[in-house]
Amino acid sequence: MAAGTLYTYPENWRAFKAQIAAQYSGARLKIASASPAFTFGQTNRSPAFLSNFPLGKVPAYQGDDGFCLFESNAIAHFLSNDALRGSTPQASAQVLQWVSFADSEIIPPASAWVFPTLGIMQFNKQATEQAKEEVKRVLAVLNQHLNTRTFLVGERVSLADITVVCSLLWLYKQVLEPAFRQPYPNVTRWFLTCVNQPQFKAVLGEVKLCEKMAQFDAKKFAEMQPKKEAPAKKEKAGKEGGKQQQPQQEKKEKKKEEKKAAPAEEEMDECEAALASEPKAKDPYAHLPKSSFVMDEFKRKYSNEDTLTVALPYFWDHFDREGFSIWYAEYRFPEELTMSFMSCNLITGMFQRLDKLRKNAFASVILFGANNDSCISGIWVFRGQELAFTLSEDWQIDYESYTWRKLDVDSEECKTMVKEYFAWEGEFKHVGKSFNQGKIFK
């Protein structure tokens, strides 16, 4: 498993790709984005840094073994696992296709449109209007592709999704207001599905979509430009005047720099404070003795290893029958299910709203059948012996749309169901329909 340091500046969307990939693969990644570990504009110009990364660009990766990489896509690829890169030659090629698509089709128009709104590029009306049209074309391509798909390649998040999401991030945050994104519902549905995955959230935090399209701010642009030296004619004020004016100007510049930095620091503090305050809510499982079954370790095995030969044996070898329970759930209203992608949205929507339950649960939920003839059922593993949803108001979401049956962990029925639902393969005799696609809550 890879282990190393990623050098970057804060909020670098190119670095986000590598960070999210590491969240999925389990790669041990240290982030150097602040002094003394890394100061952008200084550290990356030092001889020591340039000897490993000749261009002086970030993100840049240095492994604990001394292995060095620059270019964000290469770093993200290196930190991924086989599931993210594409487990077959075809899937791997498709992942590369979408990574290239992001670089060549999304980034140029996104930069031309978004950068002026951030004050880091001069506004050009013709260039901006052209960029908007190119973004529409890109979104139309994605919308068509995602019409019958949950993710860009295969049935799980891949490096394709990570890369394209990060490339669209500032568009969604700055300029894609509701009216503009309305014709592309599949793209927005997919984008929200991705950014609400715990691995994305760990890096991006809570992503808020743009409510009103940001516009070019001439004042902000002027503030972002390098300060010019005071004209020589001001020396007429005398030596003392010059001496007084210079420190004042420096103070003003320092204050402006502090003001620019302050919002990011305050926002981070608020975010961290909010996250820190969440666990203080009453834990429904606080009364239970510590379990020998480490849910997070099983989830890592499931994500990174073969299900049948590694993850499943690990599950049964370590499963705590007293501290955990296994439940079978079946959607109550199969007659209301229509298009497959809409049925999948029911599942992912429930998962997203149950985010606070993740550390105490695991589930594999499957859509069976085809359009207008389908059903949904799944296997859930909960902490404790009771159905989790009734234990906390935060968890009472969508569960009443399902019937729930606690399984006997020693029964052959339970062992067969766990195997089939976790592996997404088998006869599924109790269903009577073929496997369509599955979703994992972890």
UniProtKB/Swiss-Prot annotation:
UniProt keyword annotation of Secreted present: no
Keyword Chaperone assigned: no
Region of interest: Disordered: 224-273
Keywords: Elongation factor, Protein biosynthesis
Occurrences of domain EF-1-gamma C-terminal (ranges): 281-442
InterPro entries membership: EF-GSTs (IPR050802), EF1B_G_C (IPR001662), EF1B_G_C_sf (IPR036433), Glutathione-S-Trfase_C-like (IPR010987), Glutathione-S-Trfase_C_sf (IPR036282), Glutathione_S-Trfase (IPR040079), Glutathione_S-Trfase_N (IPR004045), GST_C (IPR004046)
Domain GST C-terminal: start-end pairs: 88-216
A molecular function GO annotation: translation elongation factor activity
Composition skew (Basic and acidic residues), residue ranges: 224-242, 249-263
Gene3D superfamilies in alphabetical order: 1.20.1050.10, Glutaredoxin, Translation elongation factor EF1B, gamma chain, conserved domain
Residue ranges of domain GST N-terminal in the record: 2-87
Listed GO CC annotations: cytoplasm; nucleus
Superkingdom of this protein's organism: Eukaryota
Function: Probably plays a role in anchoring the complex to other cellular components.
Quaternary structure (record): EF-1 is composed of four subunits: alpha, beta, delta, and gamma.
Name this polypeptide is given: Elongation factor 1-gamma
Organism annotation: Carassius auratus (Goldfish)
Gene field: eef1g
